[in-house]
Amino acid sequence: MIQKNAILDVADNSGARKVLCIGFLGGKKSATVGDVIVVSAKVAAPKGRVTKGKVYKAVIVRVKGPIRRLDGSIIRFSSNAVVLVNDQGDPLGTRVFGPVRKFPVGEFTKVMSLAVEVL
């Protein structure tokens, strides 16, 4: 579960390294895997597409807290991570690093296709 003012890792090659969660879409108080959030880039690579201080949308791909699946198994990751997306839901980067949690059918298919491992 991600709350406001959480510092998150960026799991793509858009140029950002760390982002700050500044809001949620849909009037929610917190977010989990698959939710779109509003972030501000805090640490960025000098020659990336993303500049420090600008506001972007991102989809959450990993959370530290346990996620229970329908079959009863529990999955958890070692870091909280996001992938930066545009208004249409397409990723800003061309690669996604690390494992990604599976999204519902029809949501963020391009993010899942770029990921190395989908759990």
UniProtKB/Swiss-Prot annotation:
PROSITE patterns: RIBOSOMAL_L14. SMART domains: Ribosomal_L14 (SM01374). The gene is rplN. Binds to 23S rRNA. Forms part of two intersubunit bridges in the 70S ribosome. This is Large ribosomal subunit protein uL14. InterPro entries: Ribosomal_uL14 (IPR000218), Ribosomal_uL14_bac-type (IPR005745), Ribosomal_uL14_CS (IPR019972), Ribosomal_uL14_sf (IPR036853). Belongs to the universal ribosomal protein uL14 family. Part of the 50S ribosomal subunit. Forms a cluster with proteins L3 and L19. In the 70S ribosome, L14 and L19 interact and together make contacts with the 16S rRNA in bridges B5 and B8. Keywords: Ribonucleoprotein, Ribosomal protein, RNA-binding, rRNA-binding. It comes from Anaplasma phagocytophilum (strain HZ). The keyword RNA-binding applies.
